Swiss-Prot record:
Residues 232-409 form the NodB homology domain. It comes from Escherichia coli (strain K12). Residues 1-19 form the signal peptide. GO terms for biological process: carbohydrate metabolic process. It comes from the Bacteria. Keywords: Signal. This is Uncharacterized protein YadE. The keyword Nucleotide-binding does not apply.
């Protein structure tokens, strides 16, 4: 724990130090553990074998920093020495300077890394399980086996496709309303209403299997290839801002140490809490929103645009870009009392058109989510992101299939 705390402090200084002191290649003199920040946590991300060359950046403490995925890794200085003789990093095709491919691999076990795309090659080291790591290229060896080319410590390395999987995207889960079974007499057949029992079981399932719950900021980093995230991760979202979220979802999420995002219809925020009535759709008050801020991040679900017209179509689809932009701006102002960084939007009823997308961009939203079914992948249009529903009647096996690394529709 002490070592990880030191590394966390180092991350605050690495950028400025490395700008002044250029990276240099050094060689490991023994097998060395490496650390990096993955999501919210500083964890051991693998090891590098003795005799391997990597480019490191000097730091002010007893660790070197080096490029690891979309961030920095750290290695004890005592494991390295200046490169001896004429050894050099192989890069005959200039792959080190090529852009990344918008694709990651995921590790589900300790995964061997090699110096060349061949199982007979000298081992470089190991990547730990539960990582997403960016891929430069996919290659075929002479036996027609697929290899992933990666960049680590400003050098090339290779992972067999037999040892890792392609990253099929992050699951953004969508919820709305939650009720206890015995009080749910009006919304039992409404697909957007789940039960407290089902929600608790789903969150317990995620917790027991080591899933991290990500913020929208982290999702943005994933889409834009700027952050290292774990393989087992989901984003939990609630649309509308219903009172049942604070009454039922919040205690469950807090119990399991999870975080979530609530997309709020700001015109429906109440000045004072309403008396609980499970037979109506009630919305959270100012005080109720403040009480759940330690778990929930509040983002926009528009101000007055969460309505339908006479044909049951989202009213947003008939509004001008100017009117939509005005509403988006009003929603952001209303949420500023809870969150100074209102950067994310959920389109009402999942409806959008060119006017809505342009207004979202002009309003300053970094990401916007829809109700289109599927997972989010690096390089996706940030203002047209997909999500997944898990229904009250869905089994845990269905949930497992949705959040696992299987492709979705």
């Amino acid at each position: 724990m002490y070592k990880q705390a030191v590394i966390l402090l180092l991350m605050l200084f690495t950028a400025s130090v490395s700008a002044a002191l250029p990276a240099r290649y050094m060689q490991t003199i023994e097998n060395a553990a490496v650390w990096a920040q993955i999501g919210d946590k500083m964890v051991t991300v693998g090891n590098i074998r003795a005799g391997q060359i990597i480019a490191v950046e000097p730091t002010a403490a007893s660790y070197y920093a080096f490029n690891f995925g979309f961030g920095k890794g750290f290695i004890d200085k005592g494991h390295l020495e200046p490169v001896q003789g004429r050894q050099k990093v192989e890069d005959g095709l200039g792959d080190l300077n090529k852009p990344l491919s918008n694709q990651n691999l995921v590790t589900w076990k300790d995964t061997p890394v090699y110096n060349a795309p061949s199982a007979g090659s000298a081992p470089f080291g190991v990547l730990a399980d539960n990582l997403r790591y960016p891929i430069l290229h996919k290659l075929k060896d002479r036996l027609n086996q697929t290899w992933y080319q990666i960049r680590i410590g400003d050098r090339l390395a290779y992972i067999s496709a037999l040892d890792a999987q392609p990253d099929n995207g992050l699951s953004v889960l969508t919820y709305h309303h939650i009720l206890r079974d015995e009080e749910n007499t009006r919304f039992r057949h409404t697909s957007t209403t789940t039960s407290v029992r089902a929600f608790n079981n789903q969150m317990a399932w995620l917790r027991d299997r080591g899933y991290a719950t990500l913020s929208m900021v982290q999702l943005e980093g994933y889409v834009k290839n700027k952050i290292n995230l774990p393989a087992r991760a989901v984003v939990i979202t609630f649309d509308d801002g219903l009172k049942s979220v604070s009454r039922y979802a919040y205690p469950v999420l807090k119990q399991y140490g999870m975080k979530a995002t609530a997309f709020i219809v700001t015109s429906r925020i109440k000045r004072h809490p309403q008396k609980w009535n499970p037979k109506s759709l009630q919305f959270m008050s100012v005080s109720e929103l403040n009480e759940i801020r330690d778990v929930f991040d509040f983002q926009s679900h528009t101000h007055f645009l969460h309505r339908v017209d006479g044909y049951r179509r989202p009213i947003l689809l008939s509004r001008s870009e100017h009117n939509i932009l005005f509403d988006f701006a009003r929603s952001r102002r209303a949420l500023a009392q809870f969150n100074p960084h209102v950067w994310y939007l959920s389109y009402p009823f999942g409806g959008f058109n060119d006017n809505a997308v342009k207004a979202a961009n002009d309003a300053g939203f970094h990401l916007a989510v829809t109700t289109m079914k599927g997972k989010v992948k690096p390089g996706d249009n940030p203002l047209l992101l997909k999500r997944l529903y898990i229904l009250r009647t869905d089994s845990l096996e269905t949930m497992s299939r949705l959040v696992s690394n299987q492709p979705q529709g």
